[in-house]
Amino acid sequence: MKQSVSAEQIELKSSLPGSKKVYVDGPREGMKVPMREIEQSDTNGVPNPPIRVYDTSGPYTDPAYKVELEKGIPTPRHSWILERGDVEAYEGREVKPEDDGVKVASKHTPVFPQMDRKPLRAKQGANVTQMHYARNGIITSEMEYVAIREGVDPEFVRKEIAEGRAILPANINHPEAEPMIIGRNFHVKVNANIGNSAVSSSIAEEVEKMTWATRWGADTIMDLSTGKNIHTTREWIIRNAPVPVGTVPIYQALEKVNGIAEDLTWEVYRDTLIEQAEQGVDYFTIHAGVLLRYIPITAKRTTGIVSRGGSIMAQWCLFHHKENFLYTHFEEICEIMKQYDVSFSLGDGLRPGSIADANDEAQFSELETLGELTKIAWKHDVQVMIEGPGHVPMHLIKENMEKELDICQGAPFYTLGPLTTDIAPGYDHITSAIGAAMIGWFGTAMLCYVTPKEHLGLPNKDDVREGVITYKIAAHAADLAKGHKTAHQRDDALSKARFEFRWRDQFNLSLDPERAMEYHDETLPAEGAKTAHFCSMCGPKFCSMRISHDIREYAKENDLETTEAIEKGMKEKAKEFKETGSHLYQ
């Protein structure tokens, strides 16, 4: 792992063009909630107000912050956690070479240079989940923070968490994370998957992907590493992550038994859960709904079982002809989760991997089991969200949302797309964003991004950016459709800037200012083009917005309403046409 950050990397972490990091003071001393403020230029001397938008970039876009990845980022939640008086520090488990998939610990890659902290856990008999606090009428500092980010009342946040309609993923060992909420009555969130594989990527690359993804708007990160250095990669990511981090613990557990699924045991898996909870993982994808009796149903599918976690557990169940140990030990898993406030992301191990398999018996059988497990988790006051498909044609998407809300008692839905067609490898960020926008509108709380590399390879930095931006579009479109009270403000500001030919404001208000300016400047690179009343699409003579301005100006000069001006202008042009001989071409 590189021990320093280059000037180029620091530049990449600067704020987006035309923006600056601002902070809103919270109700308690020292609480500062980050926002991104987009400046706007005046319109004929009349000021246009700055637009504040949700910010996930962490301290990296604060010019006062010095980036030192080897030290990690600030820990704003640490004092809040300790003040509640229900946690204790302890030695924790010893980091073993097999945690990183090796037999001998590496001498070159420290787990983390600043590893002087002890993990926290709940005191004997205590429950430290945000759901437990909410159900006991307590509005935590995390809930107050979230309320400011979302523009809602803290009591509303508490109630949504208490009722299970939202989760606030916030492991007590990840104090670096800026609190956020996932629920259908809040902004639709976007998750970005990162992680190495056995054949590609390094620790440094994955940390950079994390900071890159959050810069472009990823609300959470999932580390899906399956290669070497799993533990170390995760430690570096968590210590530098301003957003919640999720994992699929079965991946690392499998590495510990040399990739042989049938050698997995509950003991190995349990040890992995504790290892990751001590590091600070905020939510676990756990495929406890893949039951032995469901596996034969998948035999008639076009694409069988496509979930990695689902296929691992199916293989274990068939080899031993026993029930899924994640299901049989679920109560014990809940006991671990509530000691650290790790949220469940109940995995859809039998999700459809093709349009042909959408909404089939296997998929919905597993969903019924996830509903059952949700009730058990809630009995322990453990937070839960439900993972969803997958590959689903547009006319079958709504049924997924309706069934999830009914079967899982309104727990937040977290979906991978869904992809609405199977014919576009290389463009599956688009095929899935169509489904993501729809299911977000119907009520999904968080969308898992898909990159152009889906089904083809491990995404690089550019793919991560493309995936995040594509899914921010889908999430925002869903917020607009749901009538979120602040969603339209940015659209209205950009539309006004567009009509007034304020090109730089158009770029800066967009989700990807750099891309917008790049495309504009391909054909009109001159600085004067930034104030021109046309673009290269229509040119100066055929710009519809310029013509609209001319009509308005004509109406103003002749003291007419706009519709009257159009009618009068038409009559004058008709008269002129006749007077010049009624020739079509002059």
From Swiss-Prot:
This is Phosphomethylpyrimidine synthase. [4Fe-4S] cluster binds at residues 535, 538, 543. One of its GO terms (cellular component) is cytosol. Catalyzes the synthesis of the hydroxymethylpyrimidine phosphate (HMP-P) moiety of thiamine from aminoimidazole ribotide (AIR) in a radical S-adenosyl-L-methionine (SAM)-dependent reaction. Belongs to the ThiC family. Substrate binds at residues 193, 222, 251, 287, 307-309, 348-351, 387, 414. PANTHER family: PHOSPHOMETHYLPYRIMIDINE SYNTHASE, CHLOROPLASTIC, THIAMINE BIOSYNTHESIS PROTEIN THIC. The gene is thiC. Binds 1 [4Fe-4S] cluster per subunit. The cluster is coordinated with 3 cysteines and an exchangeable S-adenosyl-L-methionine. It catalyses: 5-amino-1-(5-phospho-beta-D-ribosyl)imidazole + S-adenosyl-L-methionine = 4-amino-2-methyl-5-(phosphooxymethyl)pyrimidine + CO + 5'-deoxyadenosine + formate + L-methionine + 3 H(+). GO terms for molecular function: 4 iron, 4 sulfur cluster binding; carbon-carbon lyase activity; zinc ion binding. Residues 22-39 have a biased composition (Basic and acidic residues). Keywords: 4Fe-4S, Iron, Iron-sulfur, Lyase, Metal-binding, S-adenosyl-L-methionine, Thiamine biosynthesis, Zinc. Residues 1-59 are annotated as: Disordered. It is an enzyme of class 4 (lyase). Zn(2+) binds at residues 391, 455. Pathway: Cofactor biosynthesis; thiamine diphosphate biosynthesis. Pfam families: ThiC-associated, ThiC_Rad_SAM. Its EC number is 4.1.99.17.
